[in-house]
Curated annotation (Swiss-Prot):
Assembly and interaction partners: Homodimer.
Protein family (similarity comment): Belongs to the UPF0210 family.
Native species: Desulfovibrio desulfuricans (strain ATCC 27774 / DSM 6949 / MB)
A Pfam family per the record: DUF711
Protein name in the entry: UPF0210 protein Ddes_0622
Length: 461
Protein backbone atom coordinates (compact mmCIF):
# COMPACT_ATOMS: atom_id res chain seq x y z
CA UNK A 1 0.00 0.00 0.00
CA UNK A 2 1.36 3.43 -0.95
CA UNK A 3 1.56 5.95 1.89
CA UNK A 4 0.24 9.53 1.63
CA UNK A 5 3.83 10.70 1.34
CA UNK A 6 4.41 8.49 -1.70
CA UNK A 7 1.24 9.73 -3.37
CA UNK A 8 2.46 13.29 -2.84
CA UNK A 9 5.89 12.37 -4.24
CA UNK A 10 4.19 11.03 -7.37
CA UNK A 11 2.36 14.34 -7.80
CA UNK A 12 5.69 16.11 -7.36
CA UNK A 13 7.16 13.99 -10.17
CA UNK A 14 4.46 15.26 -12.48
CA UNK A 15 4.60 18.91 -11.45
CA UNK A 16 8.27 19.57 -10.82
CA UNK A 17 10.44 16.68 -12.05
CA UNK A 18 9.39 16.51 -15.69
CA UNK A 19 8.10 12.94 -15.61
CA UNK A 20 7.15 11.88 -19.10
CA UNK A 21 6.38 8.83 -21.19
CA UNK A 22 9.33 8.48 -23.52
CA UNK A 23 7.51 6.73 -26.36
CA UNK A 24 4.21 5.26 -27.43
CA UNK A 25 4.94 2.89 -30.31
CA UNK A 26 2.28 1.47 -32.61
CA UNK A 27 3.17 -1.98 -33.92
CA UNK A 28 1.70 -2.85 -37.33
CA UNK A 29 1.99 -6.29 -38.93
CA UNK A 30 2.63 -6.16 -42.67
CA UNK A 31 2.21 -9.86 -43.44
CA UNK A 32 -1.19 -9.31 -45.04
CA UNK A 33 0.38 -6.67 -47.34
CA UNK A 34 2.70 -9.13 -49.08
CA UNK A 35 2.84 -9.15 -52.88
CA UNK A 36 5.39 -10.01 -55.59
CA UNK A 37 4.41 -6.72 -57.26
CA UNK A 38 6.53 -3.97 -55.69
CA UNK A 39 4.06 -1.17 -56.43
CA UNK A 40 1.16 -3.15 -54.98
CA UNK A 41 3.20 -4.11 -51.91
CA UNK A 42 4.22 -0.53 -51.09
CA UNK A 43 0.66 0.69 -51.69
CA UNK A 44 -0.67 -2.00 -49.32
CA UNK A 45 1.91 -1.07 -46.69
CA UNK A 46 1.16 2.65 -46.82
CA UNK A 47 -2.59 2.03 -46.75
CA UNK A 48 -2.38 -0.18 -43.66
CA UNK A 49 -0.10 2.21 -41.78
CA UNK A 50 -2.39 5.09 -42.71
CA UNK A 51 -5.44 3.16 -41.49
CA UNK A 52 -4.06 2.55 -38.00
CA UNK A 53 -1.61 5.43 -37.46
CA UNK A 54 -3.55 8.44 -38.71
CA UNK A 55 -4.83 9.30 -35.21
CA UNK A 56 -1.81 8.12 -33.19
CA UNK A 57 -0.15 11.49 -32.67
CA UNK A 58 -3.35 13.39 -31.88
CA UNK A 59 -4.57 10.75 -29.43
CA UNK A 60 -1.20 10.65 -27.64
CA UNK A 61 -1.30 14.44 -27.31
CA UNK A 62 -4.88 14.38 -26.01
CA UNK A 63 -4.11 11.73 -23.39
CA UNK A 64 -0.91 13.53 -22.40
CA UNK A 65 -2.81 16.80 -21.96
CA UNK A 66 -5.51 15.06 -19.93
CA UNK A 67 -3.04 13.77 -17.34
CA UNK A 68 -0.34 16.43 -17.65
CA UNK A 69 2.17 13.78 -18.69
CA UNK A 70 3.70 14.43 -22.12
CA UNK A 71 4.31 11.60 -24.56
CA UNK A 72 7.67 12.70 -25.94
CA UNK A 73 7.87 10.41 -28.98
CA UNK A 74 5.23 8.75 -31.12
CA UNK A 75 6.63 5.92 -33.22
CA UNK A 76 5.70 2.98 -35.42
CA UNK A 77 7.23 -0.49 -35.63
CA UNK A 78 6.51 -2.94 -38.45
CA UNK A 79 7.17 -6.58 -39.31
CA UNK A 80 10.78 -7.31 -40.34
CA UNK A 81 11.04 -5.99 -43.88
CA UNK A 82 13.56 -8.67 -44.88
CA UNK A 83 10.74 -11.19 -44.40
CA UNK A 84 7.70 -9.40 -45.80
CA UNK A 85 9.66 -7.90 -48.73
CA UNK A 86 11.67 -11.06 -49.39
CA UNK A 87 10.90 -11.20 -53.17
CA UNK A 88 12.70 -7.93 -53.85
CA UNK A 89 16.37 -7.16 -54.45
CA UNK A 90 18.44 -4.31 -52.98
CA UNK A 91 16.92 -1.68 -55.28
CA UNK A 92 13.43 -2.85 -54.36
CA UNK A 93 14.35 -2.70 -50.66
CA UNK A 94 15.39 0.94 -51.07
CA UNK A 95 12.02 1.72 -52.65
CA UNK A 96 10.24 -0.06 -49.79
CA UNK A 97 12.27 1.98 -47.29
CA UNK A 98 11.29 5.22 -49.03
CA UNK A 99 7.62 4.18 -48.99
CA UNK A 100 7.86 3.52 -45.24
CA UNK A 101 9.50 6.92 -44.76
CA UNK A 102 6.63 8.60 -46.60
CA UNK A 103 4.12 6.74 -44.42
CA UNK A 104 5.95 7.81 -41.25
CA UNK A 105 5.96 11.45 -42.33
CA UNK A 106 2.28 11.33 -43.25
CA UNK A 107 1.44 9.89 -39.82
CA UNK A 108 3.58 12.57 -38.14
CA UNK A 109 5.63 10.08 -36.11
CA UNK A 110 9.26 10.60 -35.10
CA UNK A 111 10.63 7.26 -36.31
CA UNK A 112 9.51 4.03 -37.93
CA UNK A 113 11.41 0.86 -37.03
CA UNK A 114 11.40 -2.55 -38.64
CA UNK A 115 13.73 -2.22 -41.62
CA UNK A 116 15.17 -5.32 -40.04
CA UNK A 117 16.64 -8.76 -40.68
CA UNK A 118 17.02 -11.77 -38.37
CA UNK A 119 20.17 -13.62 -39.47
CA UNK A 120 21.48 -15.29 -36.31
CA UNK A 121 21.62 -18.68 -38.07
CA UNK A 122 22.04 -17.68 -41.71
CA UNK A 123 20.87 -15.49 -44.58
CA UNK A 124 17.73 -15.76 -46.66
CA UNK A 125 17.52 -13.86 -49.95
CA UNK A 126 15.50 -11.05 -48.38
CA UNK A 127 18.07 -10.67 -45.59
CA UNK A 128 20.95 -10.23 -48.02
CA UNK A 129 18.97 -7.76 -50.12
CA UNK A 130 18.02 -5.64 -47.13
CA UNK A 131 21.54 -5.54 -45.67
CA UNK A 132 22.97 -4.67 -49.09
CA UNK A 133 20.43 -1.84 -49.37
CA UNK A 134 21.26 -0.27 -45.99
CA UNK A 135 23.64 2.52 -47.10
CA UNK A 136 21.35 3.88 -49.80
CA UNK A 137 18.16 3.26 -47.81
CA UNK A 138 19.30 5.04 -44.65
CA UNK A 139 20.94 7.88 -46.59
CA UNK A 140 17.79 8.62 -48.59
CA UNK A 141 15.28 8.49 -45.73
CA UNK A 142 14.84 10.55 -42.57
CA UNK A 143 12.74 8.52 -40.14
CA UNK A 144 13.55 4.87 -40.82
CA UNK A 145 15.46 2.77 -38.28
CA UNK A 146 17.10 -0.58 -38.93
CA UNK A 147 18.04 -3.49 -36.68
CA UNK A 148 19.94 -6.64 -37.62
CA UNK A 149 19.94 -9.61 -35.22
CA UNK A 150 23.16 -11.59 -35.74
CA UNK A 151 23.24 -13.78 -32.62
CA UNK A 152 21.11 -15.62 -30.10
CA UNK A 153 21.66 -17.87 -27.11
CA UNK A 154 20.07 -20.80 -28.96
CA UNK A 155 21.73 -20.34 -32.35
CA UNK A 156 25.14 -18.84 -31.56
CA UNK A 157 26.77 -15.98 -33.45
CA UNK A 158 26.62 -15.73 -37.23
CA UNK A 159 30.16 -14.47 -37.83
CA UNK A 160 29.53 -14.03 -41.55
CA UNK A 161 26.80 -11.55 -40.60
CA UNK A 162 29.10 -9.88 -38.07
CA UNK A 163 31.78 -9.43 -40.74
CA UNK A 164 29.24 -8.09 -43.22
CA UNK A 165 27.81 -5.61 -40.72
CA UNK A 166 31.28 -4.24 -39.97
CA UNK A 167 31.63 -3.37 -43.64
CA UNK A 168 28.07 -2.08 -44.00
CA UNK A 169 28.36 0.23 -40.98
CA UNK A 170 31.30 1.93 -42.70
CA UNK A 171 29.32 2.16 -45.96
CA UNK A 172 26.34 3.71 -44.16
CA UNK A 173 28.67 6.23 -42.52
CA UNK A 174 30.17 7.17 -45.89
CA UNK A 175 26.71 7.47 -47.46
CA UNK A 176 25.78 10.02 -44.77
CA UNK A 177 29.22 11.64 -44.43
CA UNK A 178 27.75 15.10 -45.01
CA UNK A 179 25.76 14.66 -41.77
CA UNK A 180 28.49 13.18 -39.59
CA UNK A 181 27.62 9.56 -40.43
CA UNK A 182 24.18 9.94 -38.87
CA UNK A 183 22.84 6.96 -40.81
CA UNK A 184 24.67 4.73 -38.32
CA UNK A 185 22.63 6.29 -35.48
CA UNK A 186 19.61 4.60 -37.07
CA UNK A 187 21.27 1.17 -37.38
CA UNK A 188 21.79 -1.28 -34.52
CA UNK A 189 23.20 -4.82 -34.42
CA UNK A 190 21.59 -7.16 -31.87
CA UNK A 191 21.92 -10.42 -30.02
CA UNK A 192 18.65 -11.87 -28.66
CA UNK A 193 16.50 -9.03 -30.00
CA UNK A 194 13.03 -8.91 -28.35
CA UNK A 195 9.94 -8.84 -30.56
CA UNK A 196 8.16 -6.00 -28.74
CA UNK A 197 10.72 -3.20 -28.27
CA UNK A 198 9.12 0.28 -28.37
CA UNK A 199 12.48 2.11 -28.37
CA UNK A 200 14.47 3.02 -31.46
CA UNK A 201 16.53 2.04 -33.29
CA UNK A 202 15.74 -1.56 -32.31
CA UNK A 203 11.96 -1.55 -32.61
CA UNK A 204 10.28 -4.06 -34.90
CA UNK A 205 7.10 -6.12 -34.62
CA UNK A 206 7.85 -9.81 -34.17
CA UNK A 207 6.06 -12.61 -35.97
CA UNK A 208 4.34 -13.74 -32.75
CA UNK A 209 2.82 -10.32 -32.09
CA UNK A 210 -0.79 -9.16 -32.78
CA UNK A 211 -1.85 -7.57 -36.06
CA UNK A 212 -1.67 -4.16 -34.37
CA UNK A 213 -0.55 -3.34 -30.83
CA UNK A 214 0.46 -0.41 -28.64
CA UNK A 215 3.73 -0.73 -26.70
CA UNK A 216 4.92 2.00 -24.37
CA UNK A 217 8.40 2.98 -23.23
CA UNK A 218 8.52 4.59 -19.80
CA UNK A 219 11.53 6.58 -18.70
CA UNK A 220 12.37 8.77 -15.73
CA UNK A 221 16.14 8.83 -15.03
CA UNK A 222 15.76 12.39 -13.73
CA UNK A 223 12.98 11.31 -11.40
CA UNK A 224 15.12 8.45 -10.04
CA UNK A 225 18.07 10.81 -9.47
CA UNK A 226 15.97 13.32 -7.55
CA UNK A 227 14.45 10.58 -5.39
CA UNK A 228 17.96 9.38 -4.53
CA UNK A 229 19.12 12.93 -3.82
CA UNK A 230 16.24 13.43 -1.38
CA UNK A 231 17.14 10.20 0.38
CA UNK A 232 20.81 11.21 0.63
CA UNK A 233 19.85 14.62 2.05
CA UNK A 234 17.68 12.96 4.69
CA UNK A 235 20.60 10.69 5.58
CA UNK A 236 18.41 8.09 7.26
CA UNK A 237 15.87 5.50 6.17
CA UNK A 238 12.23 5.29 7.25
CA UNK A 239 13.24 3.52 10.47
CA UNK A 240 15.72 6.24 11.40
CA UNK A 241 18.80 4.11 10.75
CA UNK A 242 21.74 5.40 8.68
CA UNK A 243 21.20 5.08 4.95
CA UNK A 244 22.84 2.14 3.12
CA UNK A 245 22.89 0.88 -0.46
CA UNK A 246 20.06 -1.48 0.44
CA UNK A 247 17.92 1.55 1.24
CA UNK A 248 18.97 3.24 -1.99
CA UNK A 249 17.94 0.17 -3.99
CA UNK A 250 14.55 0.36 -2.27
CA UNK A 251 14.21 4.03 -3.30
CA UNK A 252 14.95 3.12 -6.93
CA UNK A 253 12.51 0.22 -6.81
CA UNK A 254 9.65 2.31 -5.42
CA UNK A 255 10.32 5.10 -7.91
CA UNK A 256 10.36 2.64 -10.82
CA UNK A 257 7.04 1.27 -9.59
CA UNK A 258 5.40 4.70 -9.75
CA UNK A 259 6.96 5.61 -13.10
CA UNK A 260 5.81 2.30 -14.61
CA UNK A 261 2.24 2.70 -13.34
CA UNK A 262 2.07 6.11 -14.97
CA UNK A 263 3.46 4.82 -18.26
CA UNK A 264 1.12 1.85 -18.39
CA UNK A 265 -1.86 4.09 -17.62
CA UNK A 266 -1.00 6.36 -20.56
CA UNK A 267 -0.38 3.41 -22.87
CA UNK A 268 -3.60 1.61 -22.04
CA UNK A 269 -5.69 4.75 -22.50
CA UNK A 270 -4.08 5.48 -25.88
CA UNK A 271 -4.72 1.87 -26.90
CA UNK A 272 -8.35 2.03 -25.75
CA UNK A 273 -9.03 5.26 -27.64
CA UNK A 274 -7.50 3.83 -30.81
CA UNK A 275 -9.32 0.50 -30.41
CA UNK A 276 -6.00 -1.37 -30.43
CA UNK A 277 -4.74 -3.95 -27.89
CA UNK A 278 -2.16 -2.83 -25.32
CA UNK A 279 1.04 -4.85 -25.45
CA UNK A 280 3.87 -4.12 -23.02
CA UNK A 281 5.51 -1.46 -20.92
CA UNK A 282 9.28 -1.31 -21.47
CA UNK A 283 10.87 -0.30 -18.17
CA UNK A 284 14.10 1.07 -19.63
CA UNK A 285 15.61 4.20 -18.11
CA UNK A 286 16.20 6.18 -21.32
CA UNK A 287 18.12 9.46 -21.02
CA UNK A 288 18.08 12.58 -23.18
CA UNK A 289 20.91 15.09 -23.70
CA UNK A 290 19.14 17.54 -21.36
CA UNK A 291 20.83 18.14 -18.00
CA UNK A 292 18.72 16.53 -15.28
CA UNK A 293 17.46 13.75 -17.56
CA UNK A 294 20.58 11.63 -17.37
CA UNK A 295 21.26 8.03 -16.37
CA UNK A 296 24.89 8.99 -15.75
CA UNK A 297 23.92 11.50 -13.05
CA UNK A 298 22.33 8.67 -11.04
CA UNK A 299 25.83 7.26 -10.46
CA UNK A 300 26.85 10.52 -8.79
CA UNK A 301 23.74 10.41 -6.61
CA UNK A 302 24.89 6.97 -5.46
CA UNK A 303 28.31 8.23 -4.38
CA UNK A 304 30.61 7.99 -7.39
CA UNK A 305 32.52 11.06 -8.56
CA UNK A 306 31.42 10.22 -12.10
CA UNK A 307 30.15 7.37 -14.18
CA UNK A 308 33.28 5.43 -15.15
CA UNK A 309 34.85 5.57 -11.69
CA UNK A 310 35.63 2.27 -9.92
CA UNK A 311 32.32 0.83 -8.75
CA UNK A 312 30.46 1.86 -11.90
CA UNK A 313 29.55 -1.67 -12.99
CA UNK A 314 28.33 -2.53 -9.48
CA UNK A 315 26.13 0.58 -9.34
CA UNK A 316 24.70 -0.20 -12.77
CA UNK A 317 23.89 -3.76 -11.72
CA UNK A 318 22.03 -2.50 -8.65
CA UNK A 319 20.20 0.18 -10.64
CA UNK A 320 19.14 -2.21 -13.38
CA UNK A 321 17.89 -4.84 -10.94
CA UNK A 322 15.96 -2.36 -8.81
CA UNK A 323 14.25 -0.86 -11.86
CA UNK A 324 13.16 -4.32 -13.00
CA UNK A 325 11.85 -5.29 -9.56
CA UNK A 326 9.82 -2.11 -9.18
CA UNK A 327 8.49 -2.21 -12.72
CA UNK A 328 7.56 -5.88 -12.59
CA UNK A 329 5.52 -5.25 -9.44
CA UNK A 330 3.76 -2.32 -11.13
CA UNK A 331 2.74 -4.12 -14.31
CA UNK A 332 1.90 -7.61 -15.49
CA UNK A 333 2.76 -6.56 -19.04
CA UNK A 334 6.48 -5.87 -18.88
CA UNK A 335 8.48 -6.44 -22.04
CA UNK A 336 10.90 -4.95 -24.52
CA UNK A 337 14.41 -4.29 -23.23
CA UNK A 338 13.52 -3.20 -19.67
CA UNK A 339 16.74 -1.98 -18.09
CA UNK A 340 19.07 1.01 -18.13
CA UNK A 341 20.32 2.55 -21.37
CA UNK A 342 23.87 3.95 -21.52
CA UNK A 343 23.96 5.79 -24.89
CA UNK A 344 27.05 7.98 -24.93
CA UNK A 345 25.90 10.84 -27.15
CA UNK A 346 22.33 10.90 -25.79
CA UNK A 347 23.30 11.36 -22.12
CA UNK A 348 25.11 14.56 -21.09
CA UNK A 349 26.80 12.98 -18.07
CA UNK A 350 27.99 9.87 -19.93
CA UNK A 351 29.21 12.02 -22.81
CA UNK A 352 31.16 14.25 -20.42
CA UNK A 353 32.79 11.24 -18.75
CA UNK A 354 33.76 9.78 -22.12
CA UNK A 355 35.21 13.13 -23.24
CA UNK A 356 37.23 13.35 -20.01
CA UNK A 357 38.68 9.88 -20.60
CA UNK A 358 36.84 8.29 -17.66
CA UNK A 359 34.90 5.92 -19.92
CA UNK A 360 36.41 3.71 -22.61
CA UNK A 361 34.73 1.32 -25.01
CA UNK A 362 36.21 -1.51 -22.93
CA UNK A 363 34.59 -0.17 -19.73
CA UNK A 364 31.28 0.36 -21.50
CA UNK A 365 31.47 -3.24 -22.70
CA UNK A 366 31.95 -4.44 -19.11
CA UNK A 367 28.92 -2.40 -18.06
CA UNK A 368 26.76 -4.03 -20.73
CA UNK A 369 27.19 -7.40 -19.03
CA UNK A 370 24.87 -6.20 -16.25
CA UNK A 371 22.48 -3.85 -18.05
CA UNK A 372 20.19 -3.92 -21.04
CA UNK A 373 21.23 -3.19 -24.62
CA UNK A 374 24.93 -2.51 -25.06
CA UNK A 375 27.46 -0.26 -26.77
CA UNK A 376 25.16 2.55 -27.77
CA UNK A 377 25.63 5.79 -29.73
CA UNK A 378 29.42 5.68 -29.61
CA UNK A 379 31.24 7.88 -32.13
CA UNK A 380 34.50 6.35 -33.38
CA UNK A 381 37.12 7.49 -35.92
CA UNK A 382 35.97 7.39 -39.53
CA UNK A 383 39.04 5.41 -40.59
CA UNK A 384 38.36 2.53 -38.18
CA UNK A 385 38.90 -0.77 -40.07
CA UNK A 386 35.81 -2.87 -40.77
CA UNK A 387 37.41 -5.84 -39.00
CA UNK A 388 37.80 -3.79 -35.81
CA UNK A 389 34.12 -2.82 -35.90
CA UNK A 390 33.21 -6.47 -36.49
CA UNK A 391 35.43 -7.56 -33.60
CA UNK A 392 33.72 -5.10 -31.24
CA UNK A 393 30.34 -6.40 -32.43
CA UNK A 394 31.45 -10.01 -31.89
CA UNK A 395 32.57 -9.26 -28.32
CA UNK A 396 29.25 -7.66 -27.48
CA UNK A 397 27.25 -10.45 -29.12
CA UNK A 398 29.19 -12.99 -27.04
CA UNK A 399 28.12 -11.25 -23.82
CA UNK A 400 24.49 -11.50 -24.90
CA UNK A 401 24.74 -15.07 -26.13
CA UNK A 402 26.46 -16.48 -23.05
CA UNK A 403 24.35 -14.56 -20.52
CA UNK A 404 21.00 -15.14 -22.27
CA UNK A 405 20.32 -11.42 -22.49
CA UNK A 406 19.79 -8.77 -25.12
CA UNK A 407 22.91 -6.88 -26.16
CA UNK A 408 23.43 -4.52 -29.05
CA UNK A 409 25.96 -2.31 -30.81
CA UNK A 410 25.32 1.12 -32.31
CA UNK A 411 28.68 2.50 -33.42
CA UNK A 412 29.03 5.64 -35.54
CA UNK A 413 32.26 5.93 -37.55
CA UNK A 414 32.45 9.67 -38.30
CA UNK A 415 34.00 10.23 -41.74
CA UNK A 416 36.97 12.58 -41.74
CA UNK A 417 37.23 12.89 -37.96
CA UNK A 418 39.58 11.40 -35.40
CA UNK A 419 39.84 10.78 -31.66
CA UNK A 420 38.92 13.79 -29.53
CA UNK A 421 37.05 15.67 -32.23
CA UNK A 422 33.35 16.32 -31.67
CA UNK A 423 30.30 15.44 -33.72
CA UNK A 424 26.76 16.73 -33.16
CA UNK A 425 23.68 14.86 -34.37
CA UNK A 426 21.08 17.22 -32.92
CA UNK A 427 17.87 16.59 -31.00
CA UNK A 428 17.61 13.45 -28.89
CA UNK A 429 20.70 11.98 -30.57
CA UNK A 430 22.90 14.61 -28.91
CA UNK A 431 26.63 15.11 -29.42
CA UNK A 432 29.78 13.18 -28.63
CA UNK A 433 33.55 13.31 -28.68
CA UNK A 434 35.02 10.60 -30.87
CA UNK A 435 36.35 7.75 -28.73
CA UNK A 436 39.41 5.60 -29.46
CA UNK A 437 38.79 1.99 -30.46
CA UNK A 438 40.75 -0.90 -28.90
CA UNK A 439 44.13 -1.59 -30.47
CA UNK A 440 45.24 -4.78 -32.18
CA UNK A 441 44.08 -6.49 -35.34
CA UNK A 442 41.06 -8.81 -35.67
CA UNK A 443 41.27 -9.27 -39.45
CA UNK A 444 42.29 -12.95 -39.50
CA UNK A 445 39.69 -13.86 -36.86
CA UNK A 446 36.87 -12.11 -38.68
CA UNK A 447 37.76 -13.58 -42.10
CA UNK A 448 37.46 -17.13 -40.71
CA UNK A 449 33.69 -16.59 -40.78
CA UNK A 450 31.21 -19.35 -40.07
CA UNK A 451 29.34 -19.55 -36.80
CA UNK A 452 30.32 -19.48 -33.15
CA UNK A 453 28.20 -22.29 -31.66
CA UNK A 454 25.51 -21.66 -29.07
CA UNK A 455 26.61 -22.22 -25.47
CA UNK A 456 25.80 -25.30 -23.43
CA UNK A 457 22.67 -24.78 -21.35
CA UNK A 458 23.85 -26.78 -18.35
CA UNK A 459 27.19 -26.60 -16.50
CA UNK A 460 26.57 -22.91 -15.90
CA UNK A 461 30.03 -22.00 -14.61
Amino acid sequence: MLSEREVISTLNMLRNEHLDVRTVTLGVSLFDCVSHDLELFTANVQAKIRRYASQLVSVCDEVGDKYGIPVVNKRISVSPIAVVAAPFGPDGMVRVCKALDEAAKEAGVDFLGGFSALVEKGFANGDRALIEALPEALAQTDRICSSINVASSRSGINMDAVALMGRQILRVAEATADRGGIGCAKLVVFANIPQDVPFMAGAYLGVGEPDVVINVGVSGPGVVKKALDRAREAGRNEKGAPLTLLDMAEVIKRTAYKVTRVGEMIGTEVATRLGIPFGVADLSLAPTPAVGDSVGEIFQSLGLSSIGAPGTTAVLAMLNDAVKKGGAFASSSVGGLSGAFIPVSEDSSIEAAATAGLLSIEKLEAMTSVCSVGLDMIAIPGDTPAATISGIIADEMAIGMINHKTTAVRLIPVPGKGVGEEVSFGGLLGKAAIMPVPGGNAEDFITLGGRIPAPIHSLKN
